[in-house]
From Swiss-Prot:
This is UPF0145 protein SAV_4658. Gene3D superfamilies: Hypothetical protein apc22750. Chain B. It comes from Streptomyces avermitilis (strain ATCC 31267 / DSM 46492 / JCM 5070 / NBRC 14893 / NCIMB 12804 / NRRL 8165 / MA-4680). The lineage of its organism: Bacteria, Bacillati, Actinomycetota, Actinomycetes, Kitasatosporales. Signal peptide: none annotated. Belongs to the UPF0145 family.
């Protein structure tokens, strides 16, 4: 798998800055908009599940599941950023992911944080 298949995060020219911290050095929070989140639920692919079961017996990375989870997290992030953008934010503080099982048929990934308006300090 190439780097683009198992990584994620923001591009260098995003108009909404997403951080996992309470603040951003060199900026101050002008306005707190509030909580925003991006959510997606992915069903389990039978082929990946069978492959994962076999792979778990011999060990090693479950590449099919890794790729699916990366795509899922990236989609949740895109939705999170869009929510902040449409509410007038240019930053998201304290971004986190929450991953849970969804009714035994899939995986729910939620990216969440606090949308804010940031200005240079």
């Amino acid at each position: 798998m190439g780097i683009e298949e198992y990584g994620g995060g923001q591009g260098p020219h995003s108009d909404v800055l997403v951080v996992t911290t309470n603040d951003v050095p060199g900026y101050r929070v002008q306005h707190v908009i509030g909580e925003v989140f991006g959510l997606t639920v992915r069903s389990r692919h039978l082929g990946s599940q069978i492959g994962a079961g076999l792979k778990s017996m011999i060990g090693g990375e479950l590449k099919g599941l890794t790729k699916t989870l990366v795509e899922t997290r990236n989609q949740a992030m895109e939705r999170l950023v869009e929510q902040a953008r449409v509410r007038g934010g240019n930053g998201i503080l304290m971004m986190r992911f929450d991953v849970t099982e969804a009714a035994d048929v899939g995986t729910e990934v939620c990216a969440y944080g606090t949308a804010v308006v940031l200005v240079k300090a």
